[in-house]
Swiss-Prot record:
One of its GO terms (molecular function) is copper ion binding. InterPro entries: CopC-like, CopC/D, CopC_dom, Cu-Rt/internalin_Ig-like, Ig_E-set. The keyword Metal-binding applies. This is Copper resistance protein C. SUPFAM superfamilies: E set domains. Monomer-dimer equilibrium in solution for the apo protein. Dimerization is significantly enhanced upon binding of copper(I). Cu(2+) binds at residues 24, 115. Residues 1-23 form the signal peptide. Belongs to the CopC family. It comes from Escherichia coli. One of its GO terms (biological process) is copper ion transport. It comes from the Bacteria.
């Protein structure tokens, strides 16, 4: 194998290791779970695959539907967003108990690689 081929192979291996170390955070689980129907939760917990950079991560809660109202406009829900007990989690704590309806959680997660990853999911309060 020529020196050039060895250098290219070594460079490729180094880059592969570097890129695998820069994994983006993924939402691993949530409470309540996506598409679930639950009693009004006191908090919503989001659990990610990586430690979060709190300063740049966050979430918001929106009520997207209310029983008996066919044309309910989305309404932001007043809530506090805080780091979870685990550095890979965050919690959303609504200021008031959630009334029956459908809700969307929009989240933004940033880990040590500094790339923001966003997503959302819905759940229903019975």
């Amino acid at each position: 194998m020529s020196i050039l081929n060895k250098a290219i192979l070594t460079g490729g291996l180094v880059m592969g290791v570097a890129f695998s170390a820069m994994a983006h955070p993924e939402l691993k689980s949530s409470v309540p779970q996506a598409d679930s129907a639950v009693a009004a939760p006191e908090k919503i917990q989001l659990n990610f695959s990586e430690n979060l950079t709190v300063k740049f991560s966050g979430a918001k809660l929106t009520m997207t539907g209310m029983k008996g109202m066919s044309s309910h406009s989305p309404m932001p829900v007043a809530a506090k967003v805080a780091p979870g007990a685990d550095p890979k989690s965050m919690v959303i704590i609504p200021r008031e108990p959630l009334p029956a309806g459908t809700y969307r959680v929009d989240w933004r997660a940033v880990s040590s690689d500094t790339h923001p990853i966003t997503g959302n999911y819905t759940f229903t309060v019975k």
